[in-house]
Amino acid sequence: MAFDFKKKFKKFYRPSEKPEIIEIPKMNFIAVRGKGNPNEKEGEYQKAVEMLYGVAYTLKMSYKTQYKIEGFFEYVVPPLEGLWWQENVKNENYMLNKKLFNWISLIRVPDFIKKEDVEWAIKCATEKKKKDFSKVEFFSYNEGLCVQCMHIGNYNDEPETIQRMNEFAQNNGYNIELTEKRYHHEIYLSDPRKTDINKLKTVIRQPVKK
């Protein structure tokens, strides 16, 4: 059976709706950086997601090609994730004007995948699909201490959940630490094209410090 990050690391991908403090270890991803409203049709964000999945599945299926990745084992492609921020906005109000978003769109990769493997997959996907995948990069993120919980429902209702998370952190002696290297983080467990908007499951994390 293929390795599934969501099942193996439930504390990272299946938290409860009750906020908790958690230490997140360093993880490796493929990533695309961009700006703007993620809901814009055929916009930069949607193109980034398409690029990520193209490279993610090229890596996943690499064992069927002549290219061999040392230590490879079959795995389920992990869910789409995103790091989000706006310049000079450090509270939940950053959600209000989506066209001002900066973002790094992510898909986790197993530890056996290295930078050179991602570079191979970019080249392979470009040749196969006749599209530009050059914005995809290998990205390591050492997230550290966070407040985390599951948000169920519309993405537009996230500020209420974030406020509840922030209050929980502060009531337990932690401060929210949004910086140039620590970001608001979301993991998308549901496909919005196939899921009732009120049942969308999103893991939300906010970086904290004591």
What do the predicted segments below correspond to?
Residues 1-210:
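A solvent-exposed interaction/effector surface
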